[in-house]
Amino acid sequence: MSDLIQKAQKVKEASKKLMNLSESQKNLALSCISKKILDNMEYILVENKKDMENAQNKGIKGALLDRLKLTEDRIRQICKGIEDVIKLPDPVGEVISMWKRPNGLIIGQKRVPIGAIGIIYEARPNVTVDAAVLCLKAGNSVLLRGGSEAINSNVALVKTMKEGLIEAGIDEGSIEIVEDTSRETAVAMMKLNEYLDLLIPRGGANLIKTVVQNATVPVIETGVGNCHVFVDESADFEMAEKIVINAKTQRPGVCNAAEKLLVHKNIAESFLPMIVKKLMTKGVEIRGCSKTVEICKQNGIEVKEATEDDWYTEYLDLIIGVKVVDSIDAAIEHINKYGSKHSEAIVTRDYFNAQKFLDFVDAAACYVNASTRFTDGFEFGFGAEIGISTQKLHARGPMGLKELTTIKYIILGSGQVRE
């Protein structure tokens, strides 16, 4: 516990120095970090191999194991992400608006760093770098606490990034990692109001729930993605098939993958057998409503019947829940009841249904005729993201650099006093 406090203190002190660094100083630090990661690739891969072996021994497999894995190509992609962040404009110091009051006061809003940010996340080593790099570019220090599955990889990455900070002449306390991965230490971190200005959890529903229930530090919820694709009665079948297959199978272990497929009843008998067969050839397990099970059975396809819990579940695996709905209104009602307010898609040729979906679905990102897989900082043009916020306060959707800043009011006077 004392180690946690010491690291939190370092992060807090570093945040005071980072807030006034120039864009060129921060970019130099990021460039040094990228170079050090490439230089230390062999060391990082050796440490990642330890994590992979430990995970396999614990029975972790499939998409969850893939999230943990680092390769030379993935490390180069991480470094490319750093270079992309370097190219992004620094939001710190941006004057958002300015106005003059009748009494002569000039009032302005400008962007400033949030300060010291804590990130609690699960088995994805790339988050270690993404989070640190984005926080640093926005003038924030960061205290990282990853999952036990990736501890060797995460420690190796943080040690390497610290080398980059030292080379750039930046306080190495700007990036710290909590090496104790126990639940008790994580909960203690959630209560470090004295040192942390913000806490961002990245992971599954249980992690998010634990943080929200225990944290006294302000929290931005991210990540849980019970995402739907609704195939409307006017949908182009070829387009719908492409979108559903991509949204479910391209990378099933991420939060913007589709977990549920809703199909309008008027096309269910023609569309469902086709899409179910395609999904099954991709290794996807189907969990259907009673109508889905009936239609599939009539076409010689056996599928498992979904339970009520299935409609709430983020699988993060090659599993999809399928439901036949009576109308677009029923689809919207289902999404708003069971969804996680992350990313939702409609496939339709009906302009008015598309507009209704966009207006009435409560989610951070709503799509018309496109895969949910695009809800991502890179795809939105933000560079790397810190997470995808599913709440409505401060930030919503992919969180880039601007979402890691806050507003300061600047008031310029010439001796005014309030009457």
Curated annotation (Swiss-Prot):
Pfam families: Aldedh
Keywords tagged on the record: Amino-acid biosynthesis, Cytoplasm, NADP, Oxidoreductase, Proline biosynthesis
Reactions catalysed according to its record: L-glutamate 5-semialdehyde + phosphate + NADP(+) = L-glutamyl 5-phosphate + NADPH + H(+)
Keyword check for Amino-acid biosynthesis: yes
Enzyme Commission number, as recorded: 1.2.1.41
Pathway: Amino-acid biosynthesis; L-proline biosynthesis; L-glutamate 5-semialdehyde from L-glutamate: step 2/2
Record's subcellular location: Cytoplasm
GO biological process, any: L-proline biosynthetic process
Domain of life: Bacteria
GO cellular component assignments: cytoplasm
Molecular function (Gene Ontology), one example: glutamate-5-semialdehyde dehydrogenase activity
SUPFAM superfamilies: ALDH-like (SSF53720)
InterPro entries listed in its UniProt record: Ald_DH/histidinol_DH, Ald_DH_C, Ald_DH_N, Aldehyde_DH_dom, G-glutamylP_reductase_CS, Glu-5-SA_DH, GPR_dom
Purpose: Catalyzes the NADPH-dependent reduction of L-glutamate 5-phosphate into L-glutamate 5-semialdehyde and phosphate. The product spontaneously undergoes cyclization to form 1-pyrroline-5-carboxylate.
Similarity comment: family membership: Belongs to the gamma-glutamyl phosphate reductase family.
UniProt protein name: Gamma-glutamyl phosphate reductase
Organism: Caldicellulosiruptor saccharolyticus (strain ATCC 43494 / DSM 8903 / Tp8T 6331)
Gene: proA
